[in-house]
Design a protein with these regions (language model features):
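An alpha-helical repeat/solenoid feature that recognizes helix-turn-helix modules
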Residues: 1-2, 26-54, 71-104, 108, ...
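Buried hydrophobic core positions in alpha-solenoid tandem helical repeats
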Residues: 10-17, 59-60, 113-114, 167, ...
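Acidic-glycine-rich active-site phosphate/pyrophosphate-binding loop
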Residues: 62-64, 215
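Fold-core signature of tandem repeat domains
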Residues: 63, 69, 87-90, 117, ...
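Compact disulfide-stabilized, cysteine-rich extracellular microdomains and processed peptide cores
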Residues: 268-270, 311
Length: 321
């Protein structure tokens, strides 16, 4: 894959992303916070976070009293999945911004997730499968530990381990994870779990037994699920981006070179099926901002994946400072 072409695409799509700022920035008014978190991730990986402090502070402003966030910024009922995504963007963004309000917000979010965890280690959210929901606070806690955030460190470690073990114990024998109500195909949830929840342990502290084997089995299942044209899940743009990004970080950490061709095929398909500007949910569908953020994130991560230093792509998950 030609990196010059990738860089040109990144430049063009980032310009389009900025043109659409009113659609994702809290400084422009109330927003869908899942989209806001996607946008803040683009800023992180485009290395422009310091130019957008107001957006991070606006996210702090809509944090609930319980430490969580609601799916829509003007609402007040916190839910786990979006709260973890918001908290993750704040702790990663604050490495560059060094702002006391962000520090306090992250610590409130830690309290929220510690209070919300169920007795069996899972977290729940009515909008998401329990496994997918659980992977998000686990991912947040991965970064909390990687960045040496001291707030309630012992409690965080215990909650993280219980959440990760909940996920590990529910992997199917074929290497995938499934949920009949939310993820019957297993594609998206498997891609999420190995990159967001599990593989970080191999970088941070190797606390959990079975993680390497679990991630390797999950990656092989993603290889098997890829269609001949390079897509996943019946030409689902979102899930194809998820799988392509997941394999970038997982195969780098595992040292598995078999993923290279799979990743390149996925990226070729993603680029071939973009709109003039941005991406839709399926080929030929109208561009939407969330998918465009995912597309930009995929391109930016591929650029890091191609770096000589294998740690560069891992840094874009926050698992290495």
């Amino acid at each position: 894959m030609n990196l010059e072409k990738i860089n040109k695409l990144i430049k063009a799509e980032y310009a389009f992303f900025l043109q659409q700022k009113k659609g994702w920035s809290l400084t422009a008014g109330p927003q869908d916070l899942e989209l806001v978190a996607h946008a803040l991730r683009v800023l992180l990986h485009a290395r422009t976070t310091p130019d957008f402090l107001a957006d991070y502070l606006a996210l702090v402003d809509c944090q609930g009293k319980d430490g969580g966030w609601s799916p829509f910024s003007a609402d007040r009922e916190s839910t786990v999945w979006v709260s973890a995504f918001c908290g993750l963007m704040l702790i990663r963004g604050n490495r560059l911004l060094h702002h006391e309000r962000l520090t306090r917000s992250v610590r409130k979010a830690i309290d929220y997730f510690l209070d919300a965890q169920q007795s069996d280690g899972r977290w729940v959210d009515p909008r998401w499968a329990d496994l997918d929901t659980t992977s998000h606070p686990v991912s947040f806690f991965n970064v909390v530990m990687a960045l040496d955030e001291p707030h309630r460190r012992h409690d965080v470690l215990q909650a993280w381990e219980r959440g990760a073990r909940f996920i590990l114990d529910r992997q199917s024998a074929d290497g995938g994870w499934y949920d009949n109500d939310f993820h019957p195909s297993g594609v998206e949830i498997t891609a999420h779990l190995i990159q967001d929840a599990l593989v970080a342990d191999l970088v941070i502290d190797h606390c959990l037994s079975g993680v390497r084997e679990s991630c390797a089995k999950g990656a092989v299942k993603l290889y098997e699920w890829q269609a001949a044209d390079g897509s996943w899940d019946e030409e689902n743009v979102d899930h194809t981006m998820d799988c392509t990004r997941s394999l970038m970080v997982v195969t780098r950490i595992l040292g598995d070179e078999r993923g290279e061709d799979i990743i390149v095929r996925g990226l070729h398909w993603i680029i071939a099926n973009k709109n003039l500007q941005g991406w839709g949910d399926f080929p030929g569908m109208e561009t939407n901002l969330e998918r465009t953020c995912d597309g930009l994130d995929t391109l930016l991560k591929y650029k890091a994946y191609r770096s000589i230093d294998p740690r560069d792509v891992v840094k874009l998950w926050g698992y290495i400072p």
